[in-house]
């Protein structure tokens, strides 16, 4: 009897997952996330240098971050730009150095371009959530400005806090010292989960449940880590792009990786947005009021 009950529960669970995946596939087709990801990748490449310039300027305003700027850069490029991170870092730092020498008008233009990226992300995610009510211009600008100003500070503060925790004598014992390499190794994954969770909860102009956002964030973070390893493996083992593009090989590598990254971000958003729809369908279906979400 127990085995039959267990098998029945497993069957119901698998059937529920299957129906959810069908609904998710239908959503992905309707929202054309491949086209959205391409648009966001294009805007990201245009905004990359301005965004980095504004970020570094914000960090430079706080003396506590000046000594660890190199560590922050190394962490970001190593963990978010696989394989070609060193080359990209050299070029971006050179571009940022040139941009920082500009006039007040030029710096204002950099901020505007950086806001364009955040605005594009905002519109894409709210379209995924089918948000009908738009934010007012004042609220939207305030949110974008908060992301630009507070985002870099929070990232820098988290890295400083992590470095401080790792350096504590509390972790120098034999039992705990073996855990630190594992903790540091998992740090990029934890940062990714936190970043995706914040993105999926704050950006949509409607209430998003924590557990729904956490599910989407965990899936996106895991795919992001797998994507980094897979992309780095391809770039190092099959370097045909270098023979084709030569010195410009970094450009297509960066574009492809940014495109794949946005595909992952949007997929996590679709999962988060699809969860309440599917759960509402399940509750209504049990009451005999609705038809299946997807065939």
Curated annotation (Swiss-Prot):
PANTHER family assigned: INNER MEMBRANE PROTEIN YHJD (PTHR30213), UPF0761 MEMBRANE PROTEIN YIHY (PTHR30213:SF0)
Similarity-based family: Belongs to the UPF0761 family.
Membrane-spanning residues: 4-24, 45-65, 102-122, 137-157, 183-203, 213-233, 247-267
**What membrane topology does this protein have?**
Multi-pass membrane protein
Q: Which Pfam families match?
A: Virul_fac_BrkB
Q: Where in the cell is it found?
A: Cell inner membrane
Name of the protein: UPF0761 membrane protein SO_4401
